[in-house]
Structures are given as structure tokens and as C-alpha cells.
């Protein structure tokens, strides 16, 4: 064995060490991106729930037009954020709930148009303030007030999206490997045997 072989082995070791360090960094970066997206998605879904609950408050529509417009604009902004961010999600539960949300919104398009809300490109909502201001208050209450109202349904779906996104952020370990609480419970024998 010559000096050349020693250099080759050392070079190979350095190369492999650099390769695996890069792989670890990429896994960590991917995990951090997933956690960041999940955190942002959860925050946006929480904001949507708050905005939908505000619209579901029957006293809102007894207030002046500017207050109502502000609440509807806030709702639309939060809704559009959730639609945009859910489109970038890899979480099946987030995607399923977001698809239900946009589908339900589509089914209510005619009713929403009475409040000046239309569905635009990419399933995002747009507002015609003049139509909203001219809308009958009882029509607005029928759209936004009550458990089964549009706002009530959006509020519940926003909660589901938020919960799903929070689950996504915690499903990866610090090393970037998938972690399942159910699998961990089975492995540790902590699942109840009762049905």
C-alpha cells in the first residue's frame, strides 16, 4: 500500500462525510419547512375561525355599514389565506378539509352574491362593497348567523384545518423522520385493550 492509497481513503472518507452531512441538512430543512408551513396554516385557519365567528354574531348586523364591511373584508382575507396556504400543504387532512371548504363555498355562491361576495380565480373570494352595503340585513343574517349558516360551517371547517395542520407539524422528529403517536403507543403497549 502506497501513500496514494492513504490519500484516496482519506479523500473518500471526507467525501462521504460531506455527502451525509448534506443529506442530514436537507432532511432538517425539509422538516423545518413542513413545520413552518403547518404553523402558518394553523395560524391562518385560526384567524379564519375568529373572522367567521365574528360574522356569526347577530349583533354585528345591527351596527353601521363600515363595521360590517370591515368584518366581511377580514373574513375574506382570512379565507383567501387559508385557500392559498392549503394548496401548498402535503397534509391529506388539511387538503380534504380545504376541498370541502371551497366546495361548500361554491354551493353557496348564489347566496353569497347577495352579500357582494363572489368566487374568483383560484377559489378565492372577492367583495363588492356597494352590494354588501345595499344588502338587506335579514339576508346577511341568514347567510352568516346560526350554526348551519355559511359562517358557522366555515368556522367549524377552519377549526378542523387548524387541528389537522397542528398534527402535521408534530408528525416529524428532530431528525426529520416520521413519527406516529398511534404507532408509538402500539410499540410501547399503551393502547387500551377495551373497545
Question: Each PLM stretch: what is its role?
Answer:
Residues 1, 5-195:
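Polar, low-complexity export/assembly segments characteristic of proteins
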